Regions:
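Long, repeat-rich segments with strong aromatic
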Residues: 199, 203-289
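Extracellular glycan-targeting catalytic surfaces
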Residues: 18-178, 186, 254-363
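Extended amphipathic alpha-helical interaction segments
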Residues: 157-169, 179-188, 195-202, 209-218
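Positively charged n-region of N-terminal signal peptides that target proteins for export
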Residues: 1-4
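Hydrophobic h-region of N-terminal signal peptides that target proteins for export
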Residues: 9-18
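Short gly/pro-enriched beta-turn/loop segments at secondary-structure junctions
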Residues: 187-190, 240
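Amphipathic alpha-helical segments within well-ordered protein domains
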Residues: 95-96, 138, 192-193, 246-250
Length: 363
């Protein structure tokens, strides 16, 4: 599930009020509706969201004051409570799409209830790993922002702007901290970008482009590896690092026309090359034992806690790279072939791939 965008129409100081950069524009929504009606493979993919949306109509928002997940082991009550509350993001995402597809205001009204409940209770922090878990909430809001009441829009805008501001000034992105160059920073940049484009607030423009270029220059390697892969010795972190970067690239490309997916750093690295590096591991031509040489103590703690996939030597499973390749397929549909090989299914389709099909990509 995650973030796609539309064509740019910039005013002198603000984005066009009708533009939607973190979700689908009106023409794309129309195409989505038509596709869901005519093509069973698309309607089947959306069915799960429809079920969630219908169930959510009778549910009460469950916002949490501060999201606490980063650095906590599975089973920690603080993490458990946060992840339970964050189920709201998936619910509101489903509600927003159900509204756009059906036009039924009951879905919009319930989505608005979730937005405002979170806006009133949740507090912004500068921790990007905690804040990134609100991504679906931001995407959903972008989809329906022009449809909610002015009062609800102001309340939700202020909440999201507070998150973006906290991340812009995040201590984790400063100095010589490892979090200033690893996946933390990739997620920080993504959330700033998605919120900025959702709110049509161009005060973040220079921050987004400057920070992204800096991150690509320090995080990507010419051979297709990333800082995170080398540090953690796990494709789990190659994917967790480049997924937010690709999401940011999609938003920027759709808003400005600049393609950072193929953009070369000073040493010749590109995000595309980092995706391509994973291809033989996705197709099964190569295997990779995960976390064997990780230098991060927390990885060992998670393994000792019995968390799936963190035991040193666990083989990378191609299914865990599918979302990465689905995002990359926005820029190059050739990745769909790799995805289907990885899934051993010539007809495989997921929601991100469907969204790519609904999305108008510039030539």
């Amino acid at each position: 599930m995650k973030k796609f965008v539309c064509f740019l129409a910039l005013a002198v100081t603000t984005f066009c009020a009708d533009a939607q950069f973190a979700s689908l524009d009106k023409n794309e929504v129309k195409l989505m509706r038509e596709s869901l009606k005519k093509d069973r493979k698309f309607s089947k993919i959306f069915r799960n969201f429809q079920v969630i949306a219908d169930q959510s109509l009778s549910e009460t928002p469950n916002p949490i004051a501060v999201i606490l997940s980063q650095g906590l082991l599975a089973g920690d009550p603080r993490k458990t409570a946060s992840l339970k509350a964050l189920e709201d993001a998936n619910k509101v995402y489903a509600l927003a799409f159900a509204y756009k597809i059906s036009g039924k205001t009951a879905y919009l009204n319930k989505a608005t209830d979730f937005f405002t409940a979170w806006a009133k209770i949740n507090k912004a922090t500068d921790d990007p790993i905690n804040q990134t878990k609100l991504e679906d909430m931001v995407t959903a809001y972008d989809l329906v922002r022009e449809d909610v009441t002015a009062q609800s829009r102001t309340l939700t805008d202020d909440w999201l702007r507070g998150i973006a501001d906290a991340l812009v000034d995040s201590k984790y992105a400063k100095g010589s901290r490892g979090t200033a160059i690893n996946n933390w920073n990739s997620h920080r940049i993504k959330m700033i970008a998605l919120i900025a484009y959702t709110l049509h607030d161009n005060k973040y423009d220079s921050v987004i482009s400057t920070e992204l270029e800096k991150q690509l220059n320090v995080n990507l390697n010419p051979d297709g590896t990333t800082h995170d892969l080398m540090e953690r010795d796990a494709f789990h972190y190659q994917t967790y690092d480049i997924e937010p970067l690709i999401s940011t690239c999609i938003a920027i490309y759709r808003a400005t026309g600049k393609n950072y997916f193929d953009w070369k750093t000073a040493n010749g690295s590109t995000i595309k090359n980092c995706v391509d590096y994973m291809t033989p591991y996705m197709t099964g031509e190569k295997i990779h034992p995960e976390f064997v040489k990780s230098t991060v103590a927390f990885d060992k703690k998670r393994a000792e806690n019995g968390e799936k996939g963190y035991a040193p030597g666990t083989l990378f499973e191609p299914v865990n790279g599918v979302h990465t390749f689905s995002l990359a397929a926005y820029f190059d549909k050739g990745y769909n072939t790799i995805i289907r090989r990885a899934m051993h299914d010539d007809n495989y389709l997921n929601w991100r791939m469907a969204l790519n099909a609904f999305t108008v990509v510039k030539p």
